[in-house]
């Protein structure tokens, strides 16, 4: 667990500096990273970010003012607002990832097989639902 804590600390520090280089807070940068996977409803975004809905509203308001995201009504329920990354939001997200040198350099020290194995292990530990 200690190694996981250290690795997450390095990643978070690297991410925070990279987001700051785009004049974003870590929370704003993380929101863009989540949206890079695809549009999300405001409620789902708050759950994913583990924050209060009012907090996510403020984050989205600031990102929207910068033209990085936009709100769109959901096709099946117009009361629901989905948040969508704009082309500029995609560019900024990619720029943040590109600036994460410490993380990228660490991962580059792994061969393809080791990277695939790390990805599979992380997915098994943090993403996959336990069978049952």
Predicted segments, located by residue:
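N-terminal helix-turn-helix DNA-binding core of bacterial DNA-binding proteins
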Residues: 13-52
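Basic amphipathic alpha-helical segments that dock to polyanions
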Residues: 32, 45, 60-66
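Charged, amphipathic alpha-helical coiled-coil/dimerization segments
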Residues: 12, 61-126, 130
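Short helix-to-turn junction characteristic of helix-turn-helix DNA-binding domains
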Residues: 4, 8, 35-38
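Residues within helix-turn-helix
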Residues: 42-43, 54, 61, 81
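Active-site phosphate/pyrophosphate-handling residues
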Residues: 2, 30, 54, 116
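Ser/Thr-centric signal marking residues that sit
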Residues: 25, 57, 86
């Amino acid at each position: 667990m200690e190694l996981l804590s250290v690795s997450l600390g390095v990643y978070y520090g690297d991410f925070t500096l990279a987001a700051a280089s785009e004049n974003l807070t870590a929370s704003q940068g993380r929101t863009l990273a989540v949206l890079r996977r695809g549009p999300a409803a405001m409620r789902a975004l708050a759950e994913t970010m583990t924050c209060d809905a009012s907090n996510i509203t403020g984050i989205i308001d600031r990102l929207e003012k910068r033209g990085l995201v936009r709100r769109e009504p959901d096709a099946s329920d117009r009361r629901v607002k989905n948040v969508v990354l704009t082309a500029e939001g995609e560019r900024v997200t990619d720029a943040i990832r590109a600036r994460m040198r410490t993380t990228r350099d660490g991962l580059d020290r792994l061969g393809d097989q080791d990277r695939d194995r790390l990805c599979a292990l992380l997915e098994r530990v943090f993403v996959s639902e336990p069978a049952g």
